[in-house]
Amino acid sequence: MKEIIDGFLKFQREAFPKREALFKQLATQQSPRTLFISCSDSRLVPELVTQREPGDLFVIRNAGNIVPSYGPEPGGVSASVEYAVAALRVSDIVICGHSNCGAMTAIASCQCMDHMPAVSHWLRYADSARVVNEARPHSDLPSKAAAMVRENVIAQLANLQTHPSVRLALEEGRIALHGWVYDIESGSIAAFDGATRQFVPLAANPRVCAIPLRQPTAA
């Protein structure tokens, strides 16, 4: 904890004064344009990867960057999605997986997680991705795990669209969905192209979307 407290003291001493005007503005309101849903993994820092300032991203993080399908008893992820879309009215949602994801590797390798029942239950929300991934050939476990990361991003994009707030925003043409996979070693991002159903380098394809803004559905 000493390093964390020392870091806070350095923030107060050096970083905060440089952004004092920004924090004063943010003290009473926020208006992020993007909901960023990522894994809890310590190696993926959304604000660092996207070079965003405080107030720019509304962030949800959990093991496996999972969005459970909407159900009769919505949980914390569902509530956060609804708030971001209906109250904050974000214009973009990013679901971001990453290389060497422990959760997806555990699924791909069929690891027994009886000693972590809560984790085991949570990862069931990636079952649709697991089924697709198991049906495809893979040369080795690392390639199978990497494919699982990609399939999971696609599956969570589908789950996201079961949420009423997201579905309405899509129909109204005021939100776009993005599926990314961040590579820790290279710092690159592969983005899911909804038109081709392929992942492509984001740097070379900055406009690619899983689901772009649509024309509003006629009443």
From Swiss-Prot:
Cofactor(s) essential for the protein: Zn(2+)
EC code(s) of this entry: 4.2.1.1
Note accompanying the cofactor annotation: Binds 1 zinc ion per subunit.
One GO term describing the cellular component: cytoplasm
Reaction(s) catalysed by this chain's protein: hydrogencarbonate + H(+) = CO2 + H2O
Keywords associated with the record: Lyase, Metal-binding, Zinc
GO molecular function: carbonate dehydratase activity; identical protein binding; zinc ion binding
GO biological process, one term: cyanate catabolic process
Binding sites annotated in the UniProt record for Zn(2+): 39, 41, 98, 101
Keyword Zinc set for record: yes
Induction / repression: By cyanate.
InterPro entries assigned: Beta_CA_cladeB, Carbonic_anhydrase, Carbonic_anhydrase_CS, Carbonic_anhydrase_sf
Pfam family, one: Pro_CA
Family: Belongs to the beta-class carbonic anhydrase family.
Record note on quaternary structure: Oligomer.
Function comment: Reversible hydration of carbon dioxide. Carbon dioxide formed in the bicarbonate-dependent decomposition of cyanate by cyanase (CynS) diffuses out of the cell faster than it would be hydrated to bicarbonate, so the apparent function of this enzyme is to catalyze the hydration of carbon dioxide and thus prevent depletion of cellular bicarbonate.
Protein name: Carbonic anhydrase 1
Organism: Escherichia coli (strain K12)
Gene designation per UniProt: cynT
